[in-house]
Amino acid sequence: MSNRPFTAKFPRYPENGDEVFIRGKLKDDAKSFSVNFCLPRPAQVAEHQTPPYIALHFKTIYDERDDTSRVVLNWKNLQWQQEEVLDNYWHVDRSQTFRVVFRLHEDCIKVFVNSVDHPPDYQFPVQLPLDQIESIELWDDVEHVEEISFRYDNGNC
């Protein structure tokens, strides 16, 4: 069973252009790491279970056999949908602190490594309502979370 070491609720529902910044450290022997952008969890779904509605599932999987890794992008509407598997070039050295920014748009979520002053490293279409995302969950082999910041686009205020 996966381990969910951290959950953070959005201070308000996100809007187009808002960002989530995460800085943390994986275990040196991490096998996987996931970030889920979750819609409200129905009362009958236990906290240790994966939520039924996930706008973005961003997972990095490390293969110990050949020292390769990959990124899996997916979403969930009761059932997991078709996943997209890409090369991992955002966080290869698990001994180093990671910094990742998720920029939320009505039609996609863009993923940036370290900062947003370059084209997105990954991008995934949003199939569930952006303004219903209420939390993010970090799963699997996280050693510690140093920071999660919610950055709101002032044009939306």
Where on the chain are the PLM-derived regions?
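Carbohydrate-binding surfaces in secreted/extracellular proteins
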Residues: I22, R94, F98-D121
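Eukaryotic short linear interaction motifs
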Residues: D29-K31, P42-V45, D107-V111, H118-D121, ...
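Ligand-recognition surfaces built from glycine- and aromatic
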Residues: M1-S2, K9-G17, G24-A30, L128-C157
